[in-house]
A protein has these predicted regions:
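Intrinsic-disorder/low-complexity regions
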Residues: 1-2, 14, 64, 73
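N-terminal acidic leader/helix
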Residues: 2-36
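A short, charged, amphipathic alpha-helix used as a generic interaction element across diverse proteins
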Residues: 31-48
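Short, mixed-charge low-complexity intrinsically disordered segments
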Residues: 45-75
C-alpha cells in the first residue's frame, strides 16, 4: 500500500481574460516540487490547462507573458 503523504493543489492562471482555475489534483511533495521547478520557465512558452469544469484551454505565449501563475496548495 502506498503510504506517501499527498495533498491537494490547484493551478490558477490570472490574466486580462479572467481567472482560470485548474482541475484540483492530489500530489506528493516530490511532484509538488517538480511543478514549482517547471513553473520557473512558465513565461518562456505557451501554457495548457484543464479547468475545474473540464474545459481544456491553450494560452499562446503572448497571453502567458501577461499572466500570473499561481500554484495553490490546499492543506
Amino acid at each position: 500500500m502506498d503510504n506517501v503523504e499527498k495533498f491537494e493543489i490547484q493551478i490558477i492562471l490570472l490574466n486580462e481574460f479572467g481567472e482560470f482555475l485548474g482541475k484540483k489534483a492530489l500530489v506528493t511533495q516530490e511532484q509538488y516540487q517538480n511543478i514549482l521547478n517547471m513553473s520557473k520557465s512558465f513565461y518562456s512558452r505557451g501554457f495548457e490547462l484543464t479547468c475545474e469544469d473540464g474545459t481544456f484551454v491553450v494560452f499562446p505565449p503572448e497571453v502567458v507573458n501577461k499572466s500570473i501563475l499561481k500554484v495553490k496548495k490546499n492543506n
